[in-house]
Amino acid sequence: MAMGPREGGGGGSAFGFSTRQVVVAGIIGGIALFLGATRLGFIPVPIPLIGNATIMHIPAVVGGALEGPVVGLLAGLIFGVFSFLYAESPIFANPLIAILPRLLIGVVAWAVFIGLRRFSVDLASVAAGVFGSLTNSVGVVGLAVLFGFLPLAVVPTLIPQVIAEAVLAAVVTIVVVRGVLLVRSGRTTAPEVSSDEERRY
């Protein structure tokens, strides 16, 4: 597929940034930095077997769904770096566990979103939120078990936290995506992705 210059810009192209993508990447990155630096993105839980609960994955999910895998990857990188630098569990002192799954959050969210948006933008948004969040949770837990930080027997006790994070990501993603599409279209009801918007992916 030819990757020539694009006008206006938009999410979804795996390579090359439009002006809009640069702006959105800056905003998403700023939000991720704020959540990480203030620790507002990390929510203490009574039994932190795999560290705190988090909303840090949400900027990566939204960035990936709206503006493509590179924006999502950058937001995920910020999430991973903060997890590593401020590790409150030995699990996240391992950079592979702290960073690698987070790099994939936005990429998976993007892939799911572009795969489902032809059926429904709302469905695509919810699925991107869920699968992006599960990429983080399953990746972290899987690597923690693999490296011996977490006994396999305790994994079922983590399911409520995993579900809560996935539901939150789904809700926020659909709200943000609908809002952004409304702003872009100038309508009062959220449109489906237009043919012009399709080309941006």
Sequence positions of predicted segments:
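Alpha-helical transmembrane segments and their cytosolic interface
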Residues: 1-29, 150-201
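Hydrophobic transmembrane alpha-helices
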Residues: 2-65
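Internal alpha-helical transmembrane segments of multi-pass membrane proteins
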Residues: 22, 114-137, 188-201
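Hydrophobic alpha-helical transmembrane segments
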Residues: 22-26, 58, 69-77, 95-100, ...
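Structural signal for membrane-spanning alpha-helices in multi-pass inner-membrane proteins
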Residues: 32, 36, 64, 83, ...
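Interfacial aromatic-anchored transmembrane helix boundaries in multi-pass membrane proteins
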Residues: 35-51, 77-112, 153-156
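Membrane-interfacial segments
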Residues: 39-44, 86, 90, 112, ...
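Mid-bilayer segments of alpha-helical transmembrane spans in multi-pass integral membrane proteins
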Residues: 103, 107, 111, 130-145
